[in-house]
Amino acid sequence: MSKPVDHVKRPMNAFMVWSRAQRRKMAQENPKMHNSEISKRLGAEWKLLTESEKRPFIDEAKRLRAMHMKEHPDYKYRPRRKPKTLLKKDKFAFPVPYGLGGVADAEHPALKAGAGLHAGAGGGLVPESLLANPEKAAAAAAAAAARVFFPQSAAAAAAAAAAAAAGSPYSLLDLGSKMAEISSSSSGLPYASSLGYPTAGAGAFHGAAAAAAAAAAAAGGHTHSHPSPGNPGYMIPCNCSAWPSPGLQPPLAYILLPGMGKPQLDPYPAAYAAAL
């Protein structure tokens, strides 16, 4: 595309006046050097010049500017408009509850694993071995959930328990008891208001949510969990005894299992109602 005829060039500054001859000389000495590299070297050499060495070029630039203003009194510099870059939006394929923004911002690898499982349920990214064996899929999802929500020590123990229980025919029933044996190494861990898991692959992710509930109970020092009367999918961690006591504590967290709708939240399970 040819430039318009009435285009007026900007007046040269002191560096441009000095670099005219220097650029031509350097291009002759280095014919294969790119123009950007030549400009970079010329800029470094210009900074090394003293004020007395720059003075003649500064005076010449002032003279050229005065001549330019006399020839083009209505001249106005109009820079080229650069296209605005589109802002990139953060996309999370794995549902992250409130209070875990730092984990999402840090691009936690376990979140990427959860995103892969979530996308694979509908897009075929999950290996066929995991689809054929829901026990192994449950163990893998439980380990990924433990790495996100619990410290490294508790997460390692949870992953080991899930892997050990995956080979047993009663793994889903025995996984909670194995997870309860983990020592409470992170008693100060805050609970999220709700933990949302993907609804695809109910058999595999049911075991994952059960493992996460057991890990939450072990981390917080709870002895067992109660199912909510309104929906058995809600597991409430609790450390109440068989006999009623005045120091009963309210539930600390609700864990939503896949395939269950969100009912009216019941703050106290049937055990509390019977005790009262």
UniProtKB/Swiss-Prot annotation:
One of its GO terms (cellular component) is nucleus. PROSITE patterns: HMG_BOX_2 (PS50118). One of its GO terms (molecular function) is DNA-binding transcription factor activity, RNA polymerase II-specific. Keywords: Activator, DNA-binding, Nucleus, Transcription, Transcription regulation. InterPro entries: HMG_box_dom (IPR009071), HMG_box_dom_sf (IPR036910), SOX_fam (IPR022097), SRY-related_HMG-box_TF-like (IPR050140). SMART domains: HMG (SM00398). Disulfide bonds: none annotated. One of its GO terms (biological process) is positive regulation of transcription by RNA polymerase II. Residues 8-76 bind DNA. Pfam families: HMG_box (PF00505), SOXp (PF12336). It is found in: Nucleus. May play a role as an activator of transcription of OPRM1. Overexpression of SOX21 can up-regulate the OPRM1 distal promoter activity in mor-expressing neuronal cells. May play a role in ameloblast differentiation. PANTHER family: SOX TRANSCRIPTION FACTOR (PTHR10270), TRANSCRIPTION FACTOR SOX-21 (PTHR10270:SF313). This is Transcription factor SOX-21. It comes from Homo sapiens.
